[in-house]
């Protein structure tokens, strides 16, 4: 049994929640802290691949973070995650090519754990928190959060109430709908007008050799397009299942595993919506369901060779002799042009052509484009202070709340929320 009152309840055991828990447990050991999650084990980026970026602005929402603030907190993130920073080489060669095309190549301090080793990292982190007195309640779904004159706390499974002095809500990207419901019920103003829509590219390492020099190269193109989440070594494209549709994602195993000679990365376009369409989440769900409908209940994939010739890919010809590798995620072969909005596809294709000039080979006919890859983390509450407080005793943080875009930014957001709680003690 667990106590029905805690000093702090943290909803979500991902990096944002963990960051808050570690900071609170370290600086105020007497606090009673409960972490609750609907999953059995911490989900999100820590479980899937666990790629970490330690250079601002990657992973940080620039509206809520200055360089000085990020650089103050990032060493605290490193203290607990203990990253093995990857080396880079030949960066200037690629950077000079990029600059001639008005493309920016960022120099980022990175670490990569790998999907096969991520559970061990999560277990180490949870064991350390348990040793420090933090309680965990897995496989319990929080259905509401409240903060009123009658008290502060959470509701589990629609019936059971647990009281708290403070509540930190960190449900991650998949919790965006829950977060919106809570904000609407509590009359918390929020903005939801940004969404990232794009494709995931899969090819051989020979066609994208930059990954031998720079594990996750961060290219920023004109028109709001960027590369995101590059995986190599033993890399696979995977499905992310949501209620009513599936999205594309990618991951890789650790360097200890035998490679499969494949590379995958996302090309995402950031879209800021204006009147009359204002909900990035609604647009994302619409585009995802449209693609799944065209794909017969699955996402789509198309070879670059077919795309350049203006014809759809078919299941019968997808693995013919011209193509040097089969898809690691065999979804529906088809025509991306039927599903991707024309303006988005035009900007992504322009970015791909520039990337092929910087790293010749990426537009080999066998290269596969998967769609849709969509990042739904656009909720941005109206924060009351720099600690991400949304009401007297409620804090909202992480990718789902728009304070971060990745593991390190989410962890740093948790630290800032924890600082707010400690500041108010």
Model-derived features: positions:
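Cleavable N-terminal targeting peptides that direct proteins into the secretory/outer-membrane pathway or into
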Residues: 82-83, 98
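Residues forming the flavin
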Residues: 1-65, 88-96, 101-425
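Conserved catalytic/binding loops enriched for acidic/polar residues
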Residues: 69-77
